[in-house]
Amino acid sequence: MKKTIIITGTSSGIGFSLAEYFGKQGHRVYGLSRKKADSKLFTSIPTDITEKSQIDRAIEEILSKENRIDILINNAGMGMVGAVEDSNKEEIMKLFNLNLIGAVQMMTVVMPKMREQKSGQIINISSIGSEMGLPFRGFYSASKSALDKVTEAMRYEISAWNIELCSLHLGDIKTNIAENRIKTAVSEPYKNIFYKVYSTMNSHVDHGVEPVEVAKYIEKLLLKNKWKAHYYFGKFGQKIGIPLKWILPQKTYENLMKKYNNLLEVKR
């Protein structure tokens, strides 16, 4: 059965791959992003999801054509790199405004229609990094963790209407995410540390999972009748970090994280 699917952040990266993949399957796919996407496989509607009025307009346009919304994939987001000490309020607010508030606004706008239908599926794209504080990505981890907690709370609130909702935690995916990160100015005390971690971070992305594999995973997830609150997708070496955090002594776990992020041999 063909579905009406809304995906945010579709001008590039994971969102673009998702939209094209489901478009090829014959679904009616609408991509929302600030820049209009160049694709014949889905309908692109320029939308800044940090502005609720723009979301309202986009959803109204979609409903005028389809009169239903089956699936929302909240994919739009950005990264942020830099030391906590070096970060400033404006950068932090910009990050949370997209990664958290934008996603919440999307859910609140589609919810009335899904409630009327007594059906719907919502996937909030999160990160394996939401389960831990990543060095020099602390606010990114925090923004995704905040979305996870909203997702958990909302699952209780909407359980009466047969609407499925989950967080999908991704590991490193091979995309151009580095181009869209907020990069905080690095102060002198952190320069030697930061650039080693930053180089390692980019290498992990360059060797990450192909975006189409995310689409295939989501395709299988959408076939499930009852969802868990959290799903995890990525390389084993990244996913295993989540249970290890709770199994290992804290100092041992922190040393593993330092090694993974190329921090063990850093001299200040």
Where are the regions that the model predicts?
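N-terminal Rossmann NAD(P)H-binding glycine-rich loop of SDR-like oxidoreductase domains
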Residues: S11, A19
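The beta1-alpha1 cofactor-binding region of Rossmann-like NAD(H)/NADP(H)-dependent oxidoreductases
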Residues: T47-R57, K89
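Substrate-binding pocket helix/loop in short-chain dehydrogenase/reductase
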Residues: A83-V84, E91-M93
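Active-site helix of classical SDR
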Residues: M107, S143-A146
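A short, exposed helix-loop element centered on a Lys and neighboring polar residues
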Residues: M107-T108, E152
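Residue(s) in the substrate-gating loop at a strand-loop-helix junction
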Residues: S127
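C-terminal beta-strand-loop-alpha-helix "lid" module of Rossmann-like NAD(P)-dependent dehydrogenases
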Residues: Y156-V205
